[in-house]
Regions:
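Short hydrophobic alpha-helical segments enriched in small aliphatic residues
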Residues: 3-6
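Aromatic (phenylalanine/tyrosine) cluster motif
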Residues: 8-14
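Flexible, gly/pro- and Lys/Arg-enriched active-site loops
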Residues: 27-60, 65-182
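Extreme N-terminal starter segment of soluble prokaryotic enzymes
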Residues: 20-25
Length: 182
């Protein structure tokens, strides 16, 4: 059998089994879709961190190993932390899986799962996602080495937007923007 047909069937079998699972991708993106530099966020936006905590608490979060390594205190509390890694099999406070499909298969088919980065995991998860929860930052970073994948406006509809100006805690204008898949 042709390998591409088997992969295609496997993909649709996985989707059929997980049709009720709600997968959200959450990220803070600059105007050029940059998300990080040297495994660090580009901008310090306390309200973005509050929104992240509010949305993800009580849910499963899936991330790559580098994203896990970037967390100052390790696994995030009050969430099921799932890490994708082919080289590490154990991390404190987290479950480790070799690939996204296996990680998603370990989740309940009725739960909401948040994909929290990084670049490679976002790219892998985008075809499965139901919602994008983006913080769109009105800035172009001087340096960036990680980017959010491009997504087609014909596949996504803006469902929420909340704009914020600069203030004493936020040096950049930003907007919380949610998109849902058509």
């Amino acid at each position: 059998m042709n390998g591409s047909h088997a992969d295609f069937r496997s993909f649709f079998s996985f989707i059929a089994q997980n049709i009720l699972m709600y997968i959200s991708i959450i990220a803070a993106v600059a105007k050029n879709m940059a998300i990080g530099n040297e495994n660090r966020l580009l901008y310090w936006l306390p309200n973005d961190l509050k929104r992240f905590k509010s949305l993800t608490t009580g849910h499963t979060i899936i991330m790559g190993r580098k994203t896990f390594d970037s967390l100052p205190k390790g696994a995030l509390p009050n969430r099921r932390n799932v890490v994708l890694s082919r080289s590490v099999s154990e991390l404190p406070g987290a479950e480790v899986f070799a690939d996204l499909q296996t990680a998603l298969s370990s989740c309940s088919d009725t739960e909401e799962v948040y994909i929290i980065g990084g670049e490679s995991v976002y790219r892998q998860a985008l075809p499965f996602a139901n919602r994008l929860c983006l913080t769109e930052i009105d800035a172009l970073p001087a340096n960036a080495d990680a980017f959010f994948p491009t997504f087609s406006p014909s596949e996504w509809k803006e469902s929420f937007r909340e704009c914020h100006d600069t203030d004493e805690k936020h040096e950049q204008k930003y907007s919380f923007v949610d998109y849902i898949r058509y």
